[in-house]
Amino acid sequence: MTKCHKLVCTALVAAAALALALATAACGGGEKPTEVVLLTHDSFALSDGVKQAFERESGLTWRILQAGDAGEVVTKALLTAGNPEGDVLFGVDNNLLARALEGDLFVPYESPGLASVDETWVLDPEHRVTPIDHGEVCLNYDKAWFAERGLAPPASLDDLTKPEYRKLLVVENPATSTPGLAFLLATVARYGEGGWQDYWRRLRANGVLVVDGWEEAYTVRFSGAAGSKGNRPIVVSYASSPPAEVIFRTPRPEEAPTGVVESSCFRQIEFAGILRGARNEEGARKLIDFLLSRRFQEDIPLQMFVFPVNREAKLPPEFERFAVVPPDPLTLAPEEIEANRERWVDEWTRIVVR
């Protein structure tokens, strides 16, 4: 081989090496990501052992980034669409789903874990989001308050407008509260586009109390909450609130001190999705699979007080005995909610608080 030929060969090898190096750098240095980031709301909770189980099984560090309530999380994700802060978003519910899908936040992924999930919970046929849990927002009432006065607790939304229930109800503002919005949607679903406004006029005339959020409504104003000095025996809360009252009271009561008006319940489903532009899409798929696993699903009830969607997951005894799963909850299509939510909240504000 001539000296010139050797120089050419050396140059070609060097060029090839440089091209390979550049290609490798463009692909993130050829190193697999070592963590997966979950973007979620402030109410997300899980046991330490469950988090450690995922990290042990996947070989990844699971970082949890909490960013406000569900609405704030979705808004922030939309602002960073395509260049997300995390790999998976958990907490978008059916009230926010159409907004998130229209914003092209997610990439499709059909998890094998969906084989254990009823079709009832799957609202996106393209599997851009995966159902993880469900809960119902319902009227709760203080059993002792009604028993002491010989008054039957309300059995329907209509009952709340009757004279005997005057000044007994506290609700959350739908402009500032997730359960407050769900209750407004329940009245839209029950009375229709032409009737819900009159229903709220009747509630206002009957002395409904409106507060900003669930914390004040339930723990301060509602008479049935443990330690509360409230004087309102009816509140908008959750179907899982009665078992929570049993669990957190000392000593534990034999029966739940609060009840649920089943005909008032509005269904909420929470979803998780892989964010478009995720830095660790492979890890994101593993995390979605884990969120559907029995290990995580059975941790949900006592951590976040909602229900698992995996039909094979076992409920804790407190949920089996005291929780309510209404057979026919009120619902609205996500697309209908997205198209009308702001207008409905504005109308509600004019009718109820102005």
Question: How would you name each of these model-derived features?
Answer:
Residues 272-331:
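Mature extracytoplasmic/periplasmic domains
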Residues 182-263:
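Ligand-binding pocket segment of bilobal, Venus flytrap-like solute-binding proteins
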Residues 84-89, 107-144, 158, 167-174:
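A structural signal for short loop-to-beta-strand junctions that line the ligand-binding cleft
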Residues 1-36:
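Short, low-complexity disordered leader/linker segments with a strong preference
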Residues 27-99, 220, 354:
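Early extracytoplasmic/lumenal segment of secretory-pathway proteins
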Residues 317-354:
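Extracellular/periplasmic bilobal clamshell ligand-binding domains
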Residues 94-105, 124-152, 180-190, 269-273:
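Periplasmic solute-binding protein
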Residues 106-115, 129-130, 158-161, 233, ...:
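Short beta-strand->loop
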